[in-house]
From Swiss-Prot:
Keyword Cell division appears in the UniProt entry: no
Note: Cannot substitute for SCY1.
Top-level taxonomy: Eukaryota, Viridiplantae, Streptophyta, Embryophyta, Tracheophyta
Ranges in a coiled coil: none
GO CC annotation terms, alphabetical: amyloplast membrane; chloroplast membrane; chloroplast thylakoid membrane; plastid envelope
Organism: Arabidopsis thaliana
Keywords associated with the record: Amyloplast, Chloroplast, Membrane, Plastid, Protein transport, Thylakoid, Transit peptide, Translocation, Transmembrane, Transmembrane helix, Transport
Membership in a protein family: Belongs to the SecY/SEC61-alpha family.
Residues of the transit peptide: 1-34
Name of the protein in question: Preprotein translocase subunit SCY2, chloroplastic
Gene ablation phenotype (knockout): Embryo lethal.
Gene name in the database record: SCY2
């Protein structure tokens, strides 16, 4: 090859093989180059052909010293042929001429070394920590935006965080109390009517969330009754979603009123355990009642926020989490008792497992049971129902009317309603309330027979199941008109509303009967197991609430999961 056809080779770490004969020559001429071959960062090899023979120019840069060294080698054709054909030869026999680097290369090497030395001596630049924090915050914001972009993840995060906050408030003690003097059963449900919901003994007495959900539940019960009695509220209930929002605001103000009343009663009756009882009674009552009202309204806000921005019903989920928390102590007691004699407890455990399975199956049937009303579409055809990926999964459309649309909310409402007179009797000590407490205690031998309590319990569960604050048939009829659908053999308009009202009343009637029977049977089993096992029992009423809450949570998740595809389908048809 001629000088214009120079070949450039780039080697890393080890440019020349140790077995090659030219390695001995290079180690003799430049020992530092070959004695530490792995420390050489890069080696550039330029080969060219001249009139006298061949020429090699090698440039290498050392990794540690940051210094460039270059030299040139001229060799003849005989050297090339001998080096390629022989495996090893003496360096004295090589026909090699070494051309040392010129002065320009030396000056460039010295200038490079001086510049590297000055660069090493230069002080380190200042690192702006604030900019690092800004970059980190930007990365976190981007990750948060990606995470909360999904409606499912956002609602799941809100539900989990608010449920944790609802439990934290029960362990924040109110200031100004000597808790060594507070008895263990103070402000507990002494009637036994809510003991089947689980044990809450691990919570701190007189905590920030001491009132819990009782103000909201009482306000909801009163408003449900008034919506069927007062003409103005009956008219407001028939206005649809707007009327439902106004009723919710009325429930909030009623909750605030009952929270103030309950907080004043608790603050006044707890004076005997206060450290300010002798010096500042008024100050103690005002401060304690204010904190209790704040805690109760915080619980109300948590319930409403979970229902609107999360999954499921807020009050059911909060009570469900409290029940599961209380089960830890129950399971601990059970394991301590059966650890020594497992064979004696085996029939009892198998019986509990069988009853638990049956109760769970009935709870699923009560929660998921529905009646389907067929529909006909006259505005457009359902050709998209048979396409893959369509949000409409049924070829034949229908309206589902659940036999128990409120889930286990009637059971919760009835349980707390029957426990409220017992709480007032323990606080106020009124003879009338004490008699009511004995009547509403099925385990008492002084009051009425147990069947009285069970009858009252079943009646209220049935009553709360058939109540409907929102006018659902009217909303469904309006929605069907917008969708261009109708019920077969039923005229649109008033006839559709009357037909849907009849169907809703029928399904809720039979669903209320089934739920009241299941809840009453579970309560009877709870009281029986509590009588034969002093110290612990598994509440089957709480199992109903847990199963119902989980199914309602799953139903809510599924609804929000199919919402995007359903919205696209509705926009396609101009709804």
């Amino acid at each position: 090859m001629n000088s214009s056809q120079a070949c450039f080779f780039h080697f890393s770490l080890r440019p020349i093989s140790l077995s090659h004969p030219s390695y001995a020559f290079l180690s003799k001429r430049d020992p530092f180059l070959c004695s530490q071959p792995r420390k050489c960062l890069t080696t550039n090899l330029n080969m060219s052909r001249t009139r006298q023979g061949h020429s090699i120019q090698m440039n290498r840069r050392h990794l540690l010293m940051k210094e460039r060294k270059s030299f040139s080698i001229n060799y003849s054709d005989k050297f090339r042929d001998d080096s390629m054909s022989s495996e090893e030869m003496h360096t004295d026999a090589l026909d090699v001429e070494i051309i040392p680097p010129d002065s320009q290369d030396i000056r460039n090497s010295q200038n490079s070394a001086v510049s590297n030395t000055l660069q090493d001596d230069r002080p380190k630049s200042f690192r702006n920590r604030f900019l690092d924090f800004v970059r980190i915050s930007s990365v976190l914001n981007t990750a948060a935006e990606r995470f909360f972009k999904s409606e499912i993840r956002r609602r799941l995060f809100v539900t989990a965080v608010l449920l944790v906050l609802s439990r934290v408030g029960y362990f924040i003690p109110l200031p100004g109390f000597d808790r060594r003097l507070i008895p263990q059963d103070y402000l507990s449900f002494v009637s036994g009517s809510v003991e089947e919901l689980g044990e809450f003994g691990a919570e701190i007495k007189l905590s920030l969330f001491q009132l819990g959900l009782s103000p909201q539940i009482i306000a909801s019960i009163i408003m449900q009754v008034l919506c069927h009695v007062l003409p103005s509220l009956v008219k407001l209930r028939k206005e649809g979603l707007d009327g439902h929002e106004k009723i919710k605001s009325y429930i909030w103000w009623l909750s605030f009123f009952f929270a103030i009343v309950e907080a004043l009663v608790v603050a006044y009756t707890s004076l005997q355990y206060s450290v300010f009882a002798a010096t500042a009674q008024v100050k103690h009552v005002m401060m304690t009642s204010s904190l209790l009202v704040c805690g109760a309204m915080t619980m109300t806000w948590l319930c409403d926020t979970i229902s609107e921005s999360g999954f499921g019903h807020g009050s059911s989920l909060i009570i469900c989490v409290g029940i599961l928390t209380g089960y830890t102590e129950t399971l601990h007691k059970m394991l301590n008792q059966i650890s020594g004699s497992f064979s004696n407890w085996l029939p009892y455990l198998l019986g509990l497992l069988g009853i638990f399975t049956v109760v769970t199956m009935f709870a699923v049937v009560v929660t998921e049971g529905c009646r389907k009303i067929k529909l006909q579409y006259y505005g457009f055809k359902l050709a998209s129902a048979s396409r893959e990926g369509s949000p409409i999964t049924e070829v034949e459309p229908y309206i589902p009317f659940n036999i128990n649309p409120a889930g286990m909310q009637p059971v919760l409402t009835t349980t707390y309603l029957l426990a409220f007179p017992s709480i007032l009797a323990s606080i106020l000590g009124s003879p009338f309330l004490l008699n009511m407490k004995e009547i509403l205690n099925p385990e008492s031998t002084v009051g009425a027979p147990p069947w009285v309590y069970y009858s009252i319990y079943a009646f209220f569960v049935f009553l709360f199941n058939i109540f409907d604050i929102a006018n659902l048939p009217k909303e469904i009829a309006d929605y069907l008109n917008k969708m261009g659908a109708r019920i077969p053999n039923i005229k649109p308009g008033k006839a559709t509303i009357e037909y849907l009202t009849k169907i809703q009343a029928s399904t809720r009637f039979w669903g209320g009967l089934l739920l009241s029977f299941l809840a009453t049977a579970s309560t009877v089993l709870d009281h029986y197991l509590r009588s034969i096992n002093q110290g612990f029992s598994i509440g089957f009423t709480s199992v109903l609430i847990i199963v119902g809450s989980i199914i309602e949570l799953r139903r809510s998740y599924h609804a929000y999961n199919v919402m995007p595809s359903l919205s696209k389908a509705l926009k396609r048809y101009g709804v």
